[in-house]
Amino acid sequence: MKWLLLLGLVALAEGLIHKVALVKKKSLRQSLWENGLLEDFLKTHSLNPASKYFPTEATTLSANQPLVNYMDMEYFGTISIGTPPQEFTVIFDTGSSNLWVPSIYCSSPACSNHNRFDPQKSSTFKPTSQTVSIAYGTGSMTGVLGYDTVQVAGIADTNQIFGLSQSEPGSFLYYSPFDGILGLAYPSISSSGATPVFDNMWNQGLVSQDLFSVYLSSNDQSGSVVMFGGIDSSYYTGSLNWVPLSSEGYWQITVDSITMNGQSIACNGGCQAIVDTGTSLLSGPTNAIANIQSKIGASQNSQGQMAVSCSSIKNLPDIVFTINGIQYPLPASAYILQSQEGCSSGFQGMDIPTSSGELWILGDVFIRQYFTVFDRANNQVGLAPVA
């Protein structure tokens, strides 16, 4: 009888996990390359991954989320907004906090090729007079804020504030595989003081635990998932190791060291890192990354990527991140990205001066290897090897 009760409780707990399936698609970079536009794009758009974090010029009405920095993203999920629901493909981004999608008020070419929200077709939409501006590349996405019901993984998140874009300059966004972005970081970095989607879910009692978790599949187009309100142990092996946040805003933690063959190659004496599902690569200080690129034999090609010989993967050593005393090795098969164009490094350089020293971004290259729990209740991140 006790076993039946226990099984029932387990089934109940499992049922309270709300899962969003993520689909792996061609990245914006791949689409531009296939359409013969990548080289021209790279000549006119400066890739600056650092500009996403700790913006110095952002105001309460401006969010600094450069869309050009999402050009290598491959994982996307579906949400709906309004009554009846209107569907959108979004990036679930733990490196930002706002939700925004294109609207019918946007006549830019980029918007015309994507799903656009029509407030007039939603009986639950509530307008505001607030504007929002999200900077990227050589222009910015401008729009207005409104409230409506957002459905995510079967959760009806009512009275959710979100951005409706009115202008998206930059023809390259015409080819982007996503409509908008759903931010999952803390409210403190949200533009316009907008309540993030997950906070609104928790405040309304729509999830059973104040956490969400992410599994990114390495190979398949399907299989990746974001889970709201719970943890599914079938996605990882061993036990979760918990890492306290060093700062609450981004999902920021302390890294003890980064080594190769037992020798330090970066992060001497420790460094800070943001765990970010909205960054595809693994980013760090320019000088440190240049050292790593040299050690793995990477050199820049005409597509702006650091090319690596595919045949070298089997001979390259692990790069080990030690976090809270636990080692997290990345094999070459993880940090060397393979595509139809060839092989390239999964590392990219960026310099973000912070009061706590050098900053790294643990993007999808890292998260594909380690199931990640984002625990808001205890302000910590849980990591375990993927199953």
UniProtKB/Swiss-Prot annotation:
Location of the active site: D93, D276
PROSITE patterns assigned: ASP_PROTEASE, PEPTIDASE_A1
Alphabetized Pfam families for the sequence: A1_Propeptide, Asp
Disulfide bonds: C106-C111, C267-C271, C310-C343
Positions of the propeptide removed during maturation: 16-61
Residue numbers carrying Phosphoserine: S129
Alphabetically ordered keywords of this record: Aspartyl protease, Digestion, Disulfide bond, Hydrolase, Phosphoprotein, Protease, Secreted, Signal, Zymogen
Compartment(s) of residence: Secreted
Superkingdom of origin organism: Eukaryota
Residue ranges of domain Peptidase A1 in the record: 75-384
Gene Ontology MF terms in the entry: aspartic-type endopeptidase activity
A GO BP entry: digestion
The EC number(s) this enzyme carries: 3.4.23.1
Catalysed transformations (reactions): Preferential cleavage: hydrophobic, preferably aromatic, residues in P1 and P1' positions. Cleaves 1-Phe-|-Val-2, 4-Gln-|-His-5, 13-Glu-|-Ala-14, 14-Ala-|-Leu-15, 15-Leu-|-Tyr-16, 16-Tyr-|-Leu-17, 23-Gly-|-Phe-24, 24-Phe-|-Phe-25 and 25-Phe-|-Tyr-26 bonds in the B chain of insulin
Signal peptide: 1-15
Any one GO cellular component localisation term in the record: extracellular region
Function description: Shows particularly broad specificity; although bonds involving phenylalanine and leucine are preferred, many others are also cleaved to some extent.
Family note: Belongs to the peptidase A1 family.
Protein name: Pepsin A
Source organism of this protein record: Sorex unguiculatus
Phylogenetic placement of the source organism: Eukaryota, Metazoa, Chordata, Craniata, Vertebrata
